[in-house]
């Protein structure tokens, strides 16, 4: 009697269960790339005509082969069959995809074109610095939870470096409690919006237009996108316009296990070209703690929706040329007006060292440009290679009383003041954990144009690093340009304690910051101080102003 096998298959009945992307250096398996498939169902499957693929192409069809229930098969290129046959059942395909060591998106497609399973693996999934260098496989933990993503994968524990054609060495039941969530949305044209989820969604619920509504517009079509099924593409009745925001409300969407996502909202909008000053550098950690990572926080200081996949992060080499250009995001990701995003190489490490109030505002880049501990350049470029913002920083900008700046971020004080103004940067407050990634800086202050000649804000300040009134700002307004300034600070006895500015050039308005230190960079005692400001020009005009300020400290 002929064996029964399924003609029509359910998605995830056959899954990708093990990946050998980097076989060298050899641990105990042949020096060949391969993918292992497992039949998780209770019906045999004929793999004839099935194909594997990645972002660069699709393999030739698989041969006539019956994959029995709860069994495995190794798929590879023809030249690897002999070497891998010693470990299990092997079939070959032409044009076997070249598996990238750092990560790739691979998929399994049935003869009828249905995507049965897809994996967007990354080298970070090994969770082991040694094993990710080669010779070890990535194994799926629980084949009955094929949608769980990185939580369901880890490096093999087998002494050979993998378990081709056999039960995985880390096989087990995954206690996955991660709920389906809409991460973000972006417009890929004026009338199409993609919603990105954290895991695959059920195709039928994802394609029901009644499950979506959008402010000041309506949805005419919804499509769940293969091969990962973690995006839904909406077609809109009316085209979107630039510099407008819309809210998408999502209801009744299921994940691949049938769990319903609670009602949720995400923002979206049409991206605009990013010009100079639209996105600014807002915070930088260039000397992390041991085993830590640099980070750069950027801020959208415009009314535009900015696509981070069109921006790059870079530095300058010793000759002063732009170098080490790194694209911020490999996929569309919008930065909305007034929003922050933090760029780093390791989100988990960032959360271990700092309070990350908005984890969804962390973008993990494979590598950041080098930002040395003492001085360097942070450069943001747009799609045309134009400089959007640049900071030439130095560790001398840290608060002078800090003995060790390791793990302390430099924060921008006012987003509307020039990036390169050293007075516009200050060490992050100790009470904020020495860094504020993904939210407003501890030293944040907006300077507004004030009436009068000099104004000191605040009138009482306490330079103790707690993030509250650590800096005194001496703000001036002048009737015309062309003046030179001298700012001198006296104690109550009339002695000069700080020559804050000497022959400083001015505009019609501006400011200088004082951190409470004297000319020898020593902390001054509490008390009342007099700020004396002189402004003069080459035509002999002169303006003199005097004001007082109180320096306070915690008792």
Q: Predicted regions: what is each one?
A:
Residues 445-555:
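Short loop/turn motifs at secondary-structure boundaries
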């Amino acid at each position: 009697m002929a064996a029964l096998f399924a003609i029509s298959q359910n998605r995830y009945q056959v899954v990708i269960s093990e990946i050998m992307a980097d076989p060298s250096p050899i641990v105990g398996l042949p020096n060949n790339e391969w993918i292992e498939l497992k039949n998780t169902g209770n019906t045999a499957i004929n793999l004839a005509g099935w194909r594997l693929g990645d972002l660069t192409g699709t393999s030739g069809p698989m041969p006539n082969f019956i994959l029995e229930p709860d069994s495995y098969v190794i798929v590879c290129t023809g030249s690897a069959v002999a070497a891998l046959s010693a470990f299990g059942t092997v079939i070959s395909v032409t044009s076997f995809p070249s598996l990238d060591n750092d990560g790739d998106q691979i998929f399994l497609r049935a003869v009828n074109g249905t995507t049965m399973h897809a994996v967007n693996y990354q080298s970070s999934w090994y969770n082991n610095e040694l094993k990710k260098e080669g010779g070890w496989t990535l194994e799926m933990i629980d084949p009955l939870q094929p949608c769980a993503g990185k939580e369901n994968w880890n490096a093999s524990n087998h002494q050979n470096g993998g378990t081709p054609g056999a039960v995985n060495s880390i096989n087990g039941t995954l206690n996955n409690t991660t709920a389906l969530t809409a991460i973000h949305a972006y417009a890929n044209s004026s009338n199409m919006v993609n919603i990105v989820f954290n895991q695959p969604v059920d195709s039928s619920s994802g394609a029901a237009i009644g499950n979506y509504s959008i402010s000041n517009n309506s949805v005419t079509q919804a499509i769940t996108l293969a091969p990962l099924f973690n995006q839904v593409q909406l077609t809109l009745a009316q085209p979107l316009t630039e510099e407008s925001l819309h809210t998408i409300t999502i209801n009744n969407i299921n994940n691949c296990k049938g769990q319903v996502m609670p009602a949720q909202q995400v923002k979206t909008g049409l991206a605009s070209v990013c010009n100079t000053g639209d996105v600014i550098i807002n915070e930088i950690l260039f000397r992390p703690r041991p085993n830590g990572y640099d980070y750069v926080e950027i801020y959208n200081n415009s009314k535009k929706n900015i696509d981070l996949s069109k921006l790059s992060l870079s530095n300058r080499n010793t000759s002063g040329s732009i170098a080490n250009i790194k694209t911020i995001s490999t996929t569309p990701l919008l930065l909305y007006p007034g929003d922050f995003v933090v760029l780093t190489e390791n989100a988990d490490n960032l959360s271990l060292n700092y309070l990350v109030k908005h984890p969804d505002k962390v973008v993990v880049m494979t590598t950041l440009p080098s930002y040395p501990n003492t001085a360097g350049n942070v450069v943001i470029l747009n799609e045309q290679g134009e400089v959007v913002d640049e900071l030439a920083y130095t560790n001398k900008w840290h608060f002078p009383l800090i003995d060790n700046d390791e793990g302390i971020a430099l924060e921008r004080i006012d987003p509307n003041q020039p990036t390169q103004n050293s007075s516009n940067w200050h060490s992050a407050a100790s009470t904020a954990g020495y860094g504020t990634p993904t939210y407003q800086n501890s030293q944040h202050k907006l300077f507004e144009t004030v009436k009068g000649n000099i104004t000191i804000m605040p009138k009482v300040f306490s330079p103790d690093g707690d993030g509250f009134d650590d800096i005194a700002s001496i703000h001036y307004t002048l009737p015309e340009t062309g003046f030179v300034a001298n700012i001198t600070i006296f104690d109550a006895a009339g002695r000069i304690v700080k020559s804050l500015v000497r022959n400083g050039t001015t505009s019609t308005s501006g400011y200088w910051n004082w951190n409470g230190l004297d000319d020898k960079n020593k902390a001054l005692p509490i008390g009342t101080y007099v700020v004396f400001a002189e402004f003069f020009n080459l035509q002999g005009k002169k303006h003199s102003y005097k004001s007082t300020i109180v320096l306070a400290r915690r008792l």
